[in-house]
Design a protein with these regions (language model features):
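Active-site neighborhoods and metal-handling regions in enzymes and metal-associated proteins
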Residues: 1-320
Length: 320
């Protein structure tokens, strides 16, 4: 964790920001610290603090070694964690505070401003700290992806005509947890037949029929890092029209993969795949982006691969 605290402090120095408040579970996971709702991280240019309430103090003392643990007791003081943040900011003479905009309530924002502290919304900047992965992160994700592939192979062995989408989803969940996943990366998507046209189709009681497409889209978290796999399978031979579309999508995916290289922009990769689908006459149905980053990912991850993305790809970025 010390390496990532240092990375944040280097960022604060570079941007001339006095402190950074971290509330999101994603960034707390990235820092390998406590992730509970009563655990907040405050990093200044010189120190790092883990602010916890009484529910987390015992666990914090057992697990936390790089951040100074500070207990706040809202039941005695009548104030939330911002009372402790205020004390630290005053002690270290901080005048500017970076925050994650999507995590800080309007009321909290106003409380901080009343202290005379300039509040800076730094969502993109904080995300950028994580966008290029370290070697150990990549290894964790490779393991996560390998486990995901094994789970998929186990699931498809059990799929049969008459099985419901709910049952397929239940198998995915079971084999994921049985294989060592901490949790699912996102709600599992299972769609069959005409429902495979729904990119985020949640499972229903619809039953599998022979020769029709079965779409399974799921991922797991392993050592906090996620996988994300989408696969299409069939019982028996698919309808010729469906096979044609499948082959177009596969060709587009391979074109996108070929376009991924350091120096390319996210929109270049999207275009490489989109051109294939448009040339085949299906462009109007490709009404979403090509892909997105992978990582801890609970609140989204860069780089984005869509028709507007100006993100320049770098070595050790991970994406789906």
């Amino acid at each position: 964790m010390a390496k990532r605290i240092n990375k944040i402090q280097e960022f604060l120095d570079e941007k001339d920001i006095d402190a950074l408040l971290i509330k999101s579970k994603t960034v707390k996971k990235w820092m390998n610290t406590m992730t509970g709702s009563g655990c907040q991280v405050l990093i200044t240019k010189e120190h790092g603090y883990l602010i916890v309430d009484g529910r987390y103090i015992t666990e914090a003392k057992e697990k936390e070694h790089d951040l100074e643990i500070i207990l706040h007791n809202p039941h005695l003081t009548g104030r939330n964690y911002l009372g402790t943040v205020e004390e630290i900011l005053k002690k270290e003479n901080c005048k500017t505070l970076g925050v994650e905009a999507y995590q800080v309530l309007v009321k909290e924002y106003q409380e901080i401003e009343k202290l005379g502290i300039e509040v800076l919304l730094l969502d993109q900047e904080i995300a950028h700290l994580r966008i290029v992965k370290e070697d150990e992160e990549i290894e964790a994700m490779k393991k996560s992806i390998a486990i995901t592939d094994e789970i998929y192979q186990k699931v498809i062995e059990h799929i049969h005509v008459g099985m419901s989408e709910y049952e397929i989803s239940a198998l995915v969940q079971y084999y994921s947890i049985a294989s060592g996943a901490q949790q699912m990366s996102f709600d599992t998507i299972v769609a069959t037949g005409e429902r495979t046209a729904l990119p985020h189709g949640r499972p229903t009681s619809r039953k599998v029929k022979a020769h029709e497409p079965i779409m399974i889209d799921f991922g797991i978290q392993y050592q906090n890092y996620q996988s994300d796999m989408t696969r299409m399978c069939f019982i028996g031979e698919p309808d010729p029209k469906i096979k044609e579309i499948y082959d177009v999508v596969l060709k587009a995916q391979l074109a996108g993969l070929s376009a991924i290289k350091a120096g390319a922009k996210g929109k270049d990769v999207d275009k490489a795949a989109r051109d294939v689908i448009e040339a085949a006459g299906y462009g109007e149905y490709f009404n979403h982006g090509l892909g997105h980053g992978l990582g801890i990912g609970e609140d989204g991850e860069g780089p984005t691969l869509n028709s507007k993305s100006e993100t320049v790809l770098q070595e050790h970025m991970m994406m789906s």
